Swiss-Prot record:
Pathway: Carbohydrate biosynthesis; D-ribose 5-phosphate biosynthesis. Residues 162-393 are annotated as: 3-hexulose-6-phosphate synthase. It is an enzyme of class 4 (lyase). The gene is fae-hps. It comes from Methanoculleus marisnigri (strain ATCC 35101 / DSM 1498 / JR1). Its EC number is 4.2.1.147, 4.1.2.43. The active site is at H17. Keywords: Carbohydrate metabolism, Lyase, Multifunctional enzyme. This is Bifunctional enzyme Fae/Hps. One of its GO terms (biological process) is L-ascorbic acid catabolic process.
Amino acid sequence: MYLIGEALVGDGAELAHIDLIMGNKEGAVGQAFANSISQLSKGHTPLLAVVRPNLPTKPSTLIIPKVTLKKEYQVNQMFGPVQAAVAKAVADSIEEGVFEGVDIEDTVIMASVFVHPTAQDYNKIYRFNYGAMKLALRRALDRFPDVETLLHEKDRAAHAVMGFKVQRLWDPPYLQVAMDLVDRNHMNRVLDELPQNDHLIIEAGTPLIKKFGLSIISEIRERRPNAFIVADLKTLDTGNLEARMTADAGADAVVISGLAPISTIEKAIEDTRKTGIYTVIDMLNVKDPVAVVKQLKVKPDVVELHRGIDVEDTAYAWGDIPAIKKAGGERLLVATAGGIRQGVVKDARKAGADILVVGRAITASKNIQHAAEEFLEELSTEEIDQFRIMTDF
């Protein structure tokens, strides 16, 4: 047996985080248990979990401090409320039947425990660590999470300590606001007035990047830390280099021109895979987007069907979106761009578009928030998990 459990409970300085492994005494966990208790480390000395002095819990449990214990008060916290909480959680779990079918005498547990150096409240330290230990134990024995739960939750997740959410494009449709601007004050106004919405993407347009460079991404990120940000470089050469530059700047996606050589596009895609950002292929002036996608050995994340600003008086034509999706695979998203107005939103959606790219209809509006909200309403989107009350799950 080799089981792994994890849990985070509480908030503030007393927040508790438990990582544990559980296994047989004769196995890898038992060996690690013996090594830890016999090979002490300064500031991280492991201690047996005891309900009170002279009453260790079963299964035998070793507590390992994650944070270096430098001060006397930290040692007192670890040998006081933390030790009692972990031991009581294990003992109560036996009483509650959590260990049903487990040989208690042949099992050992190692629990790595986090206590922040500024934690003070003994009551909270005890209660949070008690809850975290019980939850981590149950999760380990339940083999939590299963793969289905992991895949369902991974893009909904916001790390409690990190403080911001990294957006991914898993729940179309989306509204992408293209900031084809050359004025920083105008950009800031747009960023401040756009609504906070899970289905809104922010694009640093080509003119904006040409005027201020990729460093403008950091300014956008400062104002909209949770946004999905696209850098519209329209790359024609050095695809891997410009993809890496975009990732380093903090953007979530880079736009490569569909007119670029196939090798350039493929190198860009390969580098975005390495850095964890999206590749958008802009098909502006590309006669046969389907053929381009078919030629690619590695497929992009998004294909953008794009009419240029200079030809926006021509009729709307989205091309064969189903054929593009077939060529690009089931995960491919298709965006439509160029003079998008509210009156064509539903037509674009019916044609199969996942992302609608809107520029001046929003950025040049006197009421930017209202204009964006009207487009979002046309898309009939709902905030992700808006009505979900989150605890741990």
